[in-house]
Amino acid sequence: MNKMLYIKTYGCQMNVYDSNRMVDLLETQGYNIVANMADASVIILNTCHIREKASEKMYSELGRIKKLQQSRLKAGKSKAKIIVAGCVGQAEGEEIFIREPAVNIIVGPQSYYNLPTMLEKLDSGTENHLIDLDFVEAAKFNKLPEVLKSPTVSGLVSVQEGCDKFCTFCVVPYTRGAEFSRPLEQVYREVLNIAQQGAKEVVLVGQNVSAYHGKDENGKECSLADLIKYVAKIDKIKRIRYITSHPNDMTDQLLSLHATEEKLMPFLHLPVQSGSNKILKLMNRRHSRERYLEIIQQLRELRPDIVISSDIIVGFPGEDDEDFEATLSLAKEARFGQCYSFKYSQRPGTPAAVKQQISEEVKQHRLSILQAQLMQQQLECNQKLIGKVVPVLFDRDGKYDGQIIGKTPYMQSVCIMNEKDNNLYGKIVNVKILTASASSLFGEVYADS
């Protein structure tokens, strides 16, 4: 049987991790990954539900797949099996079958380990529509195979899933379930595995990774700081990052680790969502503007060169001009070096979705103002490195022939022209920064490297 797999990933780094694990899982069943959807016998869309636009992208893609299926039939080929995985599948369930009957399997983010069994049922011809949306977190990791290959020199490892915070705008507690942390040794073994395959950097990921509370082999509960210190013992791992955190779970132990653990990179993504205490309360964020800025100040005292990244939502129901100005001032005071900003998007089933909504025009106007400020802040952050020599981990080819791209410790992309055809992929090399834009740095290998 022709077993060709195509997978398209939407959304967060957790979804990227899940897609990689689905590939590992199905490769053990004889599937080969293909780059062209038209060549696939199985097509997986691993979906995101965080914003309305993200889920609509999936339906648009399903429309294109239906046209592809028709072309296959005309050419005398069989249809590909279509799988909707991830958070849209979890949130919308059988409604997807109603809207798009061409979909064969719907599987949630905690139950995709059952894909081999579900595909076997499809092959037997006894079923045409299958669905599995169980929240059985431990089973997922216990039943997945070992990572077969680290996709890049920077590997993602899921350590924590789900969220118990219930922010009023967010679907994560409903699509990913309650907070669950993997055992310490299980995470360590996975990091060791990808390190032995060439990964130099590990990114510990979770919906609320700073709430990690996995247990060691003796049943003792461990914090994220404990996990980072343990993973740092792996010699081949040179860089450690973690994402995404919640301010309420940033303990003194974790903050202090930024000053003492040399493998922990001087970068932190810490979403704030709003600079207004009124809006933070309406969002059920459970922290204040002042507390957030205290954390940032503490981090900068511990690690003066740290770069802070964040997420901000504009146009949340109830946000007025004064609230928006508070967000602008917080972004400036926090000196975000990077920031992802979005218009509020109603998500069905969340408390904020039923409130009085702000007009699209006002949301777009505020977003434009905020993004202009953030772009300038990011440019200024990048320009500070001009003339300096920084260690860069090269992990991918650039847009142009001979160009290679890597990351600084501060998560900035660095482009160089690899004119001497040196094999820099997977290496940490000192680079002198020559110029900077808001999105990238440009440099050359430092002569003394």
From Swiss-Prot:
It comes from the Bacteria. It is found in: Cytoplasm. GO terms for cellular component: cytosol. Signal peptide: none annotated. Keywords: 4Fe-4S, Cytoplasm, Iron, Iron-sulfur, Metal-binding, S-adenosyl-L-methionine, Transferase, tRNA processing. It is an enzyme of class 2 (transferase). Coiled coil: none annotated. Residues 383-447 form the TRAM domain. It catalyses: N(6)-dimethylallyladenosine(37) in tRNA + (sulfur carrier)-SH + AH2 + 2 S-adenosyl-L-methionine = 2-methylsulfanyl-N(6)-dimethylallyladenosine(37) in tRNA + (sulfur carrier)-H + 5'-deoxyadenosine + L-methionine + A + S-adenosyl-L-homocysteine + 2 H(+). Gene3D superfamilies: Methylthiotransferase, N-terminal domain (3.40.50.12160), tm_1862 like domain (3.80.30.20). Pfam families: Radical_SAM (PF04055), TRAM (PF01938), UPF0004 (PF00919). Residues 3-124 form the MTTase N-terminal domain. Its EC number is 2.8.4.3. One of its GO terms (molecular function) is metal ion binding. [4Fe-4S] cluster 2 binds at residues 163, 167, 170. Residues 149-380 form the Radical SAM core domain. Its cofactor is [4Fe-4S] cluster. Binds 2 [4Fe-4S] clusters. One cluster is coordinated with 3 cysteines and an exchangeable S-adenosyl-L-methionine. Catalyzes the methylthiolation of N6-(dimethylallyl)adenosine (i(6)A), leading to the formation of 2-methylthio-N6-(dimethylallyl)adenosine (ms(2)i(6)A) at position 37 in tRNAs that read codons beginning with uridine. Monomer. Belongs to the methylthiotransferase family. MiaB subfamily. NCBIfam families: miaB-methiolase, MiaB/RimO family radical SAM methylthiotransferase. This is tRNA-2-methylthio-N(6)-dimethylallyladenosine synthase.
